[in-house]
C-alpha cells in the first residue's frame, strides 16, 4: 500500500498569455509544494503556441493593405511527487492571478 502512495503524482499544466505572470505562478506552486515536504519537478517549459490573425485595414477596398495580430500562449508543466493531504489543501487554497489557466491531473 505504501508503494502506491509513493508513486502518486499531481501533474499541473499552466497556460497564460503573459510569460512573467506564468513564471510567478509556477514559483508560488513550487514554494507551496516545498513547504509541505512534497518534491516538485519543474517548471518544464512546453512549446509556445502562436495564433496569427490577418485583418483588412480598410472596410471597403485595398485588399493589399492588411494588418496582422498575434497571440502567444505560453505553457508550463509541473509534476509534484508524493503529495500529502497538506499539499493538496495548500494547492487548493493558493491564490493565483486570473490570467493563468490551470489544469490539474491526479
From Swiss-Prot:
Keywords: Ribonucleoprotein, Ribosomal protein. One of its GO terms (biological process) is translation. Pfam families: Ribosomal_S10 (PF00338). It comes from the Bacteria. Disulfide bonds: none annotated. GO terms for cellular component: ribonucleoprotein complex; ribosome. GO terms for molecular function: structural constituent of ribosome; tRNA binding. SMART domains: Ribosomal_S10. Belongs to the universal ribosomal protein uS10 family. Part of the 30S ribosomal subunit. This is Small ribosomal subunit protein uS10. It comes from Prochlorococcus marinus (strain MIT 9312). The lineage of its organism: Bacteria, Bacillati, Cyanobacteriota, Cyanophyceae, Synechococcales.
Amino acid at each position: 500500500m505504501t508503494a502506491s502512495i509513493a508513486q502518486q503524482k499531481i501533474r499541473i499544466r499552466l497556460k497564460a498569455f503573459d510569460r512573467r505572470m506564468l513564471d510567478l505562478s509556477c514559483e508560488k506552486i513550487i514554494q507551496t509544494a516545498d513547504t509541505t515536504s512534497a518534491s516538485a519537478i519543474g517548471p518544464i517549459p512546453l512549446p509556445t503556441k502562436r495564433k496569427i490573425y490577418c485583418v483588412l485595414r480598410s472596410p471597403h477596398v485595398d485588399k493589399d493593405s492588411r494588418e496582422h495580430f498575434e497571440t502567444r500562449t505560453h505553457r508550463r508543466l509541473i509534476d509534484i511527487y508524493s503529495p500529502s493531504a497538506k499539499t493538496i489543501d495548500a494547492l487548493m487554497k493558493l491564490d493565483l492571478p486570473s490570467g493563468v489557466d490551470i489544469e490539474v491531473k491526479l
